[in-house]
Curated annotation (Swiss-Prot):
PANTHER family: MATURASE K
Keywords on record: Chloroplast, mRNA processing, Plastid, RNA-binding, tRNA processing
GO molecular function: RNA binding
GO cellular component: chloroplast
Family designation: Belongs to the intron maturase 2 family. MatK subfamily.
Main location: plastid
HAMAP family per UniProt: MatK (MF_01390)
Origin species: Brasenia schreberi (Water shield)
Upper classification of the organism: Eukaryota, Viridiplantae, Streptophyta, Embryophyta, Tracheophyta
Record-given protein name: Maturase K
Job of this protein: Usually encoded in the trnK tRNA gene intron. Probably assists in splicing its own and other chloroplast group II introns.
Location(s) in or outside the cell: Plastid, Chloroplast
């Protein structure tokens, strides 16, 4: 890995990142394909592990060498006409290997730039966690008025993705090879949608292309943020697939304007309390400004995307709501600002009296029905929420079946530890526990009662976590189900958590 990073530094010239010209020679390096196929790289901060994406675990070094030899023997640039002749009989393997190699090179180049920028932030490892955004929202949203729920539009043509990369990469052979691949495997006249465009074997490449597209769509927000403050936002230097995390900057200095800036709208520069977070294609923009000003932001973004990126975005994809009356769904949580009543006792010299007041409090709960819908899709229960057996796991050993169900249950509990109403998760645990018992009963052709009697406490212990035991010592039993806990080791959303 050190050898690869050393060579990449010579090719990419990180200090001149925007003028990358020498990516194509890396496609002739055998270890590039080995690293791209390696589980350690596939389970990086950008993507899910390979077992979740459905990648084949097989890797043939011999076929990779043949692929590199064919690349060397090409005396002319590959065109979309002879691309099918080039891949030859190993079409499936080459069609997966070439995009994996290209995506791996681009991932490493972006991640090297990411690490170099994040090293200037104290404790930047904590910012990698998805849960790190919720303490920020808890600190800021209680003082704001309106929130915009935004769905970032998809590009209507694959060439838009390539044009986005051309602004950062000037390596013509690499872009030409990528264009040939896209034209060969997809109909470029159809709109890009997650289900239609991203196949399992090429999901990694298209996720990278989509991430670069979203990053460019957010470029206008970078400009406006820098114009509103003298402080440089280091967080925007980071290229992350998850979220852009604002640091908690306490004092913002409004940028002074000279005579040449008088023609620019004032609200571009004099509203520092505009906060923006994103995960994948969904983003949240909150501010203390009026509803009219939020509507201006809405139509400005729609027109900007349509004119600059040729993205067809309808105003209905951006919902503006008042925080005190509406909740928004983000990262598997239903979040909002609630008025919590408080009774304060004031003691005077001789008299004491009670004061009834209400404070704004950021609240997060787990919507149970979307989560049950995910369990239905995964075939753990039916549409009514009744647990069913997982028939595809019936051939596994008893310990593997129990371990798989326990792992899912513990991960869901770990991810939703920030909910203020954890009692709703009891139903999810019940569904998974009974589904596990019915799967074992199906395997042994027995009944659920007999399985539970035979396994006893072993079946229950697998669904309990050490974290629950530790937390029970910290908080009282009455506060255990209402206390929100955010973990800083969650770097990707749980697969069963719906994100829309």
């Amino acid at each position: 890995m050190d050898k690869l990073q050393y060579e990449l530094q010579g090719y990419l010239q990180i200090d001149r990142y925007r003028k990358q010209r020498f990516l194509y020679p890396l496609l002739f390096r055998e270890y590039i394909y080995a690293l791209a196929h390696d589980h350690g790289l596939n389970s990086s901060i950008f993507y899910e592990p390979t077992e979740n994406l459905g990648y084949d675990n097989k890797f043939s070094s011999l076929i990779v060498k043949r692929l590199i030899t064919r690349l060397h023997q090409q005396n002319h640039l590959i065109t979309s006409v002879n691309y099918s002749r080039f891949v030859g009989p190993n079409r499936s393997f080459y069609s997966q290997t070439i995009p994996e190699g290209f995506a791996g090179i681009m991932e490493i180049s972006f991640s090297m730039r990411l690490v170099s920028s994040l090293e200037r932030i104290a404790k930047y490892q904590n910012l990698r966690s998805i849960h790190s955004i919720f303490p920020f929202l808890e600190d800021k949203l209680s003082h704001l008025s309106y929130v915009s729920d935004i769905l970032i539009p998809y590009p209507i043509h694959l060439e838009i993705l390539l044009q986005t990369l051309r602004t950062r990469i000037r390596d013509a052979p690499s872009l030409h090879l990528l264009r040939c691949f896209l034209h060969e495997h997809h109909n470029c006249n159809s709109p890009i949608t997650p289900k239609k465009c991203i196949s399992i074997e090429n999901q990694r490449l298209f996720l990278f292309l989509y991430n670069s597209h979203v990053y460019e769509c957010e470029s206008i927000l970078v400009f406006l943020r820098k114009q509103s403050s003298h402080l440089r936002s280091i967080s925007f230097l980071a290229f992350l697939e998850r979220t852009h995390f604002y640091g908690k900057i306490k004092h913002l200095v409004v940028a002074p304007r000279n005579d040449s800036q008088r023609t620019l709208p004032l609200w571009f520069f004099k509203e520092p309390l505009m906060h923006y977070v994103r995960y994948q294609g969904k983003s949240i923009m909150a501010s203390r400004c009026t509803n009219l000003l939020m509507x201006k932001w809405k139509y400005y973004l729609v027109n900007f995307w349509q004119c600059h990126f040729h993205l067809w975005s309808q105003p209905s994809r951006i919902h503006i709501n008042e925080l005190s009356n509406h909740s928004f769904y983000f990262l598997g949580y239903l979040s909002g600002v609630r008025l919590t009543p408080w009774v304060i006792r004031s003691q005077m010299v001789e008299n004491s009296f009670m004061i009834d007041t209400a404070i704004k409090r950021f609240d997060t709960i787990v919507p149970i029905f979307p989560l049950i819908g995910s369990l239905v899709k995964a075939k753990f229960c039916n549409v009514s929420g009744h647990p069913t057996s997982k028939s595809v796991w019936a051939d596994l050993s008893d310990s593997d079946i129990i371990a798989r169900f326990g792992w899912i249950c513990r991960n869901l509990s770990h991810y939703h530890s920030g909910s203020s109403k954890k009692h709703s998760l009891c139903r999810i645990k019940y569904i998974l526990r009974l589904s596990c018992a019915r799967t074992l009963a199906r395997k042994h052709k027995s009944t659920v009662r007999a399985i539970c009697k035979r396994l006893g406490s072993k079946l229950l212990e697998e669904f309990l976590t050490e974290e629950q035991e530790i937390v029970s010592f910290i908080f009282r039993r009455t506060r255990l189900h209402s206390e929100r806990i955010w973990y800083l080791d969650i770097i990707r959303i749980n697969g069963l958590v719906p994100n829309s």
